[in-house]
Amino acid sequence: MSQDLLPGVTGVLALADGAILQGVGCGAVGDAVGEVCFNTAMTGYQEILTDPSYMAQIVAFTFPHVGNVGVNGEDVEQITGVAETAARGALFRDVPTVQANWRADGDFDAWMKARGVVGLAGVDTRALTRKIRETGMPHGVIAHSPDGQFDLAALVAKAKAWAGLEGLDLAKDASTTQTFTWDEGLWSWPEGYAKLDKPKYEVVVIDYGVKRNILRALAHVGARATVVPASTSAEDILARNPDGVMLSNGPGDPAATGQYAVPEIQKLVASGKPVFGICLGHQMLALALGAKTVKMEQGHHGANHPVKDLTTGKVEIVSMNHGFTVDTASLPAPVKETHVSLFDGTNAGIALDGKPVFSVQHHPEASPGPTDSLYLFERFAGLMDAAK
């Protein structure tokens, strides 16, 4: 079916509804299947593409110019180093530009090749974003072939056959398999990343696909993180006698991961230890407290999302990256809603009455994005102080 393509086309996106987007292939040669979403951030493409929360997804960047600051070894959010546990494809309006930044130590296109990320440039990302906004996040296959040869019918069939994210426990693949400690803090100019010399708190982080900047933000408030696999039991965690427990972000369906994680989270909540959940960790805490989660039509992906803190009345601009949400109507009486999205009114935070337990749907650690809600790590530290 290559005759259906325009001259010079070396990349396509085939959607499950039969739509074909044409352009110039970049990054890795080959194809990848996943859920197509859009991200509205203007910066931070390297952090986005290495965020484990994007596992099994193809990201369309709404900002047209990508690649101008290159890539480096510091802005990688994964801790596992397994490229397959992050975004598998990327869509751009313009061909990625040549880097010009003092921190760059590599070319974006070559970096995508090395990581196996299939790219497609020259796409009408505005039209694709409107399509996603109106009809939901489609299943798609992104393909790059330098000779311009594609079996379009086979690509569409592959997109149709993909089962999607619902029911998928991806956290087990994104998680570390070995326990380790972390003591690197947040970055600042001109010092670079801080070093935690004298930890004030010991925090166990359950890794469902944790971002490095969450660990750095913990170090910023004096917490040394011990990162454990997603399947770690509550008994093993409590045996370490931590000051608090962090439920990390991660990919996939929270209900699927919750099959083994929720019973352990319930034990941690019952222990009285301070618990702080972020993104997937927020959703699984909600499940552990008796609420439900549901799949979203278009999800929230970007660094410009307004969220209201109902406890203070303050509006914050935050980073979000999720395709599932907590069903507010399902929250049981002891659980109060603390944050809401001002885009669509969906839940963005909860707290448990009478317990040092809370979580948020957004990413207070940013990377990329604003740091309006970085104070939540201080709130967590305050709960650990009170519990000592």
From Swiss-Prot:
Keywords: Amino-acid biosynthesis, Arginine biosynthesis, ATP-binding, Glutamine amidotransferase, Ligase, Nucleotide-binding, Pyrimidine biosynthesis. Transmembrane segments: none annotated. It comes from the Bacteria. PROSITE patterns: GATASE_TYPE_1. Its EC number is 6.3.5.5. It holds the Pfam family GATase. GO terms for molecular function: ATP binding; carbamoyl-phosphate synthase (glutamine-hydrolyzing) activity; glutaminase activity. It catalyses: hydrogencarbonate + L-glutamine + 2 ATP + H2O = carbamoyl phosphate + L-glutamate + 2 ADP + phosphate + 2 H(+). Residues 1-198 are annotated as: CPSase. The keyword Disulfide bond does not apply. The active site is at residues 279, 363, 365. Residues 202-388 form the Glutamine amidotransferase type-1 domain. Pathway: Amino-acid biosynthesis; L-arginine biosynthesis; carbamoyl phosphate from bicarbonate: step 1/1; Pyrimidine metabolism; UMP biosynthesis via de novo pathway; (S)-dihydroorotate from bicarbonate: step 1/3. It is an enzyme of class 6 (ligase). InterPro entries: Anth_synth/Amidotransfase, CarbamoylP_synth_ssu, CarbamoylP_synth_ssu_N, CarbP_synth_ssu_N_sf, Class_I_gatase-like, CPSase_GATase1, GATASE. L-glutamine binds at residues 53, 250, 252, 280, 283, 321, 323-324. One of its GO terms (biological process) is 'de novo' UMP biosynthetic process. Composed of two chains; the small (or glutamine) chain promotes the hydrolysis of glutamine to ammonia, which is used by the large (or ammonia) chain to synthesize carbamoyl phosphate. Tetramer of heterodimers (alpha,beta)4. Belongs to the CarA family. Small subunit of the glutamine-dependent carbamoyl phosphate synthetase (CPSase). CPSase catalyzes the formation of carbamoyl phosphate from the ammonia moiety of glutamine, carbonate, and phosphate donated by ATP, constituting the first step of 2 biosynthetic pathways, one leading to arginine and/or urea and the other to pyrimidine nucleotides. The small subunit (glutamine amidotransferase) binds and cleaves glutamine to supply the large subunit with the substrate ammonia. This is Carbamoyl phosphate synthase small chain. It comes from Caulobacter vibrioides (strain ATCC 19089 / CIP 103742 / CB 15) (Caulobacter crescentus). The lineage of its organism: Bacteria, Pseudomonadati, Pseudomonadota, Alphaproteobacteria, Caulobacterales.
